[in-house]
Regions:
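Nucleotide phosphate-binding/pyrophosphate-handling subdomain across enzymes
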Residues: 1-87
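Short helix-capping segments at alpha-helix termini
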Residues: 5, 57, 109-114, 160-161
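Nuclease catalytic cores that cleave nucleic-acid phosphodiester bonds
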Residues: 157
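C-terminal helical cap/extension that packs against the catalytic core
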Residues: 34-36, 43, 78-139
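Short, active-site-adjacent cap segments at secondary-structure transitions
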Residues: 126, 148-150
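Active-site-proximal loop/hinge segments that shape catalytic or ion-binding/gating pockets
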Residues: 145
Length: 162
């Protein structure tokens, strides 16, 4: 690749600063809430989510819509993403590899103390419930599986357009 010496380092830095990657700590503000869409589907991704969340939001409790696949290190993901005081809505991912939401709730309760966890039948139902039970300024995160991000983002943009 040919180097273009006419592009300043500042321009390159600005370009990187403005770059977004859908589903990688994608922050959307709307519906009077802050929504975070992040795959966080393995231990490293969950650790990255936790580091970024802590930098931006400190210890602010959040509502998490979560699915995790059976073959993932569920406890490692949960330990990083979920903190005491959080509320979690476990949902199925649209794959036969998904963990059953009821089982996921058990793992969450066993792994993180003082967490509220329940199931929802779908990502859309969980987001509607999360929205209903949160208030202006609250944080709703969707993570644990890349499989659920498309439906979550679609729900968000649909609700924003109405």
């Amino acid at each position: 690749m040919k180097e273009d010496t006419n592009i300043s380092e500042e321009t390159i830095r600005e370009g990187f600063a403005r770059t977004t990657w859908a589903g990688r700590f994608e922050v959307k503000r709307g519906l009077d809430r802050t929504f975070i869409f992040d795959g966080a589907h393995n231990a490293a991704g969950a650790e990255s989510f936790a580091m970024t969340y802590n930098e931006l939001f400190k210890d602010t409790p959040k509502t998490v819509v979560m699915a995790i696949l059976k073959d993932k290190d569920q406890e490692a993901i949960i330990r990083e993403v979920i903190k005491s005081g959080d509320t979690v809505l476990a949902v199925p991912a649209p794959t036969d590899r998904t963990e059953v939401p009821e089982n996921l709730v058990e793992v969450i309760r066993r792994t993180v103390p003082k967490v509220t966890a329940q199931t929802a039948e779908s990502v859309e139902a969980a987001l509607a419930l999360a929205y209903k039970h949160t208030k202006t300024g609250d944080i709703i995160a969707v993570c644990g599986s890349l499989y659920i991000l498309g439906d979550a983002r679609q729900w968000f943009f649909h609700e924003m357009s109405h």
